[in-house]
Structures are given as structure tokens and as C-alpha cells.
Curated annotation (Swiss-Prot):
InterPro entries: Ankyrin_rpt, Ankyrin_rpt-contain_sf
Keywords, sorted A to Z: ANK repeat, Repeat
ANK repeat windows: 51-80, 91-120, 135-164, 166-193, 194-223, 225-253
Protein name: Putative ankyrin repeat protein L109
Organism: Acanthamoeba polyphaga mimivirus
A Pfam cross-reference name: Ank_2
Entry keyword ATP-binding: no
SMART domains named in the record: ANK
PANTHER family, A to Z: ANKYRIN REPEAT PROTEIN, GH09064P
Amino acid sequence: MWDELPVELWIHIISFVENPVKLLTCNKFFLKFIPLHCYNKIIHTKFKKNRSKNILKIAVENGYINVVKHIDNLKKKKSILVQNPWIFGYDVCILFDICCKKGHLDLIKYIYSELVRNQYSKDIRVKIWDGLKTDDIKYLTSAISHGHYDIYVYLSGCIASFNYFQKKYIIHTIIKYRQLKIFRYLFRKAPKEFRYYALKIACRYGSLKIVKFLIKKGAKIETDNYFAIDIALSNHHYRTVKYLLSTLLDVKIPVYWTWLDVMNDLLGYYEDNDKIKNIMLRSNSKICDSSFKILSLEEITYKNINELFIGQKLNAKQHKNIIDLYISNYKNRESSNENSSIEHLCCVIKHLMENMELDSIKYIITETNLDPFIANFIHKQSLEINSFDTTIFL
């Protein structure tokens, strides 16, 4: 019944719409009123405000496939209605990219098939590649970044093959946007040589679900001297680090990162300390004894202070969290554990002085507010170390 109303009445109704452009694109029935908008002052004014809103683009953005088909059909018939290029003309590549981002699979299939048909090509795979110029796999990455699994599957099936660098870029994009479902699909077809590359990228972005998936599928953590753990640590993805360490029964300490550095980073991460403790218990049996299961993270650090310092240089710049921990416990020491708190801090000071870490000693003196006991201990230690001059602190 509504389509039987006279044109004059429809023009009057449209004049009350806040944005007539949206109404005119929601159904192919309303397209015939577009040439008449200039005859109504109110509609013309509103339409002029939205002049940058291309009718064809809006129809594609909203997934109105019937409207898009109707516009194309009118163009083929060379209808006067769609002669204005500012309203009904738009670049097909941009429209295709919009569909990939918005998730309009039916429109993607339509635009794709129309492109092939118009160019009289029998090879659909080539046309999506050459006709739409997808050399930079732009449309595929648009679908990935917006999580449109069905579109990714369709487009990847339309492309004959990917070269080595395109495969790496696609893997990188999928992991960056944490698209696990798409990654699972890709993994079934990707060669094994990309597993470790994917693990490194997943550790870089902290994509824990993808990391777990790769480990279960056989990705090797120990490759390149546990470089995946190093990447996760350097990007502060401690949940990922905790998971990687928890999958290992024993870890040989890599030459370019030390357990002292790991402990400092983990102490700076105040979530799930119990899990961190359990990881340390499993990851290095020589340092962590099973009796430490009842201890806190701080107590584990204390118990292993001598082992952690072996062959390593502690300093306030690189290991501030660890030194702050000892200073804090010294300041807040109780009678029950006073001796142990003093002993721990003295052990740290002695280690720093033996390694000539003057800035770190200055830091401790400042943070302890020139504590007499600490100052006296430093002076006594300096007498044993001839090359260490305490006058620099005066």
C-alpha cells in the first residue's frame, strides 16, 4: 500500500526526515525520489548538507545489496536517474575494501562476480588479484583486522597463491589483531616453517591464546636459546612469560638474559605472584627447592639471593625492583626477622661494592636516609676493598 502513495505525498513525508540521504538508500523504491529533491527547499537543504555522502557508498556501507544491484541495473540501462557521478559513482576498489571492513560477504561476492563478468575473464582467481590490484593483500588484511572469518576464507580461496613475504605479513596481521579463529584456519594450510615465526610474533604482541595454540601444536620454545621468552619479557607480557616457563620442566639460562633480570621484571608485575612462584619452582630446580612452595615470592628471592648473584652484576638501574624490595624490608623489619632483613640488605651492599656499583650504593644510602648502621657497614666493607673509597659519599 505504501508504494501506491503519490509522489507529492512522499516528497512531503521525506521533508520531515532528519537525514533524507539515509532514507533514500535503504530501499530501491526511494531511489526514484532523488532527482526530485531539488524541488523541495527543505529536502534540498538537508541533502546539500550531506552532499559528501555518496548514495552508492552509503548503500554499500549499510549492506543494502538490493539497492546496489538496482543502481547497477539502472547504469546498464543508462537511466537518467543515476547519471550524476557525484551521487552514484564511486571507485570499485574502495567499495570492495568497505565491504571487507564491514563484513558484507554477499556484497563482496556480488562486486567480485560483476567485476569478472564486466571484464570478460574466466579466471576469477586472477581477476581478484590483478583487477582489484590486491598486490599488497589490502582487502585480506582489512577483513582480518575486523575479525571477519567468513570473508577471510572466501578471499583467501580466490587468491591462487601467496608468496613467502605475503604469508609472513598475513600471519603478522592475524596475530597482531588476536584473531584466533582465523589463525586456526591459516595454520591448517601454513607450512611448519612458519610455526616458530608465528610464536615470536605472538610473544611480541602478548597473544596468549595463540601462544598456547602454537605450543600445543609443537612450536619449540627452546629455539634460538629461548628467544621467544626474551621477546615476551622485553615487551612486558608477563602472562605469556609465565605460561611459556610453566611448560618447561627445566630451563638452561640463556646467555643474553639472566634470572636476576627475570626476577626484577616479575617483581614489578603485581598480579598472580603465586603463579610466578610456581613457575620459578618448575623452571629452575637448581635454584628453587620444593620446600619453597609455602613461601612468598619475596621469601623465594631471599632464599636464592646467593644463587641468583652468581656470575651476575646487580645494580640499581637495571634491578631497581629487587633492591627496593630489600630496602623496604629493612625499613619495615620486625623483631622476629630483624636479623634476616639486615643480613639480606648487607648481602646486597657487599655484592654491589665488590662490583664497584657506586651509583647503586648512593641509591641505597639515599633511600635509607643515611641510616647509621648502613653507613657504618659500608665503611667497614670499604676497608676490606682497598679500591673502594667511601669519601665520595660524604
